[in-house]
Regions:
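ABC transporter nucleotide-binding domain
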Residues: 167-253
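Alpha-helix N-cap/helix-start and coil->helix boundary motif
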Residues: 8, 65, 91, 188, ...
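Extracytoplasmic/periplasmic regions of membrane proteins
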Residues: 118, 229, 239-242, 257-260, ...
Length: 299
């Protein structure tokens, strides 16, 4: 399990991460979302020991990353697919990591096969790799030590639709086998499809966290009648706050039973009475981070 407690990082007078607390549970995929500059990458860098925290803790199974004796055997990390030795081949990069971790040489070919890098591609210099190939190599390196935790920052960048689906299936299977995945991505649809839990950060602070079903759950009631004006007056008389929907009908936070009772007492015939649809991830994300967004920036 990943545990972040009261984590703070300041640079002079600027606070990049401000009292952040969250967990990423075993056997689950946790989506870590936020606009550009919200503190996602800084949090992940602190978690894997690349940036010191000003205050607070970030641990993996109760230990700091820097205290792990052979971290690659316990935690797989991919923060920047372009941060690879451009003059080495993909196979050489994996071989160096394999020897550092004390793994059998066969593990290199196993990982190349897993991420679908051919022998020809594996023997090319990384400077000649596309971004998608670098992402696959980064995933291979992260999984090389058979870790039980994965920490990934934008791992789908540069992947085509087939590659994104491959990534999704890979991470879903990894979590289902008992692994812990902390995943940062600006591809909100992919996060919505794969994540079990969500953590949303804005201006360095957590603005929402919980299971995906909790955060995207439906709230309130949608109701229509043959006379929505009269229905609105009846709801107002019953002290039930409500709003008129742009596409017709009324939305209220009251439950369906209560709304139905009010309509019955007013002698109104309802043509629709249902729980409100849950918000999509994009809608929820934009609403929660509205104060931190720049025009045209989604994550």
């Amino acid at each position: 399990m990943i545990s972040v407690e009261s984590l703070t990082k300041t640079y002079g007078g600027f606070t990049a991460v401000d009292d952040v607390t969250f967990t990423a549970a075993t056997g689950r995929v946790t989506g870590f979302l936020g606009p550009n500059g919200a503190g996602k990458s800084t949090t992940l860098r602190i978690l894997v020991g690349l940036t010191p925290a000003t205050a607070g803790t970030a641990t993996i199974d109760g230990r700091r990353f820097t205290d792990l004796p052979n971290p690659g055997r316990e935690v797989g990390v991919l923060l920047d697919a372009s941060a690879q030795h451009a003059g080495r081949t993909g196979r050489e990069i994996l071989t160096v990591a394999q020897r550092t971790m004390g793994l059998p040489t066969s593990r290199v070919q196993e990982m190349l096969d897993l991420v679908s890098l051919t022998d020809d591609e594996a023997d090319r210099r990384v400077r000649n790799y596309s971004l998608g190939m670098r992402q696959r190599l980064g995933i291979a390196t992260a999984l090389l030590g058979d870790p039980h935790v994965l920490i990934l920052d934008e791992p789908a960048n540069g992947l085509d639709p087939a590659g994104i689906r491959w990534m999704r299936d890979l991470l879903r299977g990894y979590a289902d086998r008992g692994g812990t995945v902390l995943l940062s991505s600006h591809l909100l649809h992919e996060i919505e499809v794969i994540a079990d839990d969500l953590v949303v950060i804005g201006n360095g602070r957590i603005v929402a966290q919980g299971t995906k079903s909790e955060l995207l759950a439906s709230v309130g009631t949608v109701v229509r009648s043959r006379d929505d004006v009269a229905l609105g007056r009846a709801l107002q008389a019953a002290d039930i706050d409500h709003t008129v929907r742009p596409d017709g009908g009324i939305h209220t936070d009251a439950g369906t039973d209560r709304v139905g009772e009010v309509a019955l007492a007013a002698g109104l015939v309802l043509t629709e009475l249902r729980h409100a649809d849950g918000a999509g991830l994009e809608e929820m994300f934009l609403e929660l981070t509205a104060d931190t967004q720049r025009e045209g920036v989604a994550a």
